Amino acid sequence: MSQDSESFIRQLFKAFTDFSTDVESLRGFLTPDYRQLVDGRELTLDDFISHAKALRTHLHRLDINVQQIVCQGNKAATVHIAHAIRSSGESSRIKVIAFYSFKDGRISLIDELTYVLEGGNADRELGSVQ
């Protein structure tokens, strides 16, 4: 699934950052038992959907620039930069290092660490805001 994994991750990022996309459609990318580990916090599938909704409430725009991606079998890893613009106009850039596991053609796990490159203290919570 290596080539497909890269395409799949890029499609997920596109849907995740397109705020006109129905948030519930993101479930199609993830397994029912999905888990996301973000800076020591654990999110379930429902938590992830709540997270996506919260981002759409707090942000005007979100862009993700994939800097590196490696895929092998049912595993993948990315280094990407999330550029968030709040409704107030403030912006932040967050570096994300993420590991992915796939099961049954969907993502079952994302384990990620984030680092705020530009922004304030509140931006540290953007990776798991509810």
From Swiss-Prot:
TM region(s), chain numbering: none
Segment forming the signal sequence: none
Gene Ontology terms for molecular function: cyclase activity
Highest taxon, organism lineage: Eukaryota
Gene Ontology cellular component annotations, sorted alphabetically: cytosol; nucleus
Protein name: Uncharacterized protein C11D3.04c
Organism: Schizosaccharomyces pombe (strain 972 / ATCC 24843) (Fission yeast)
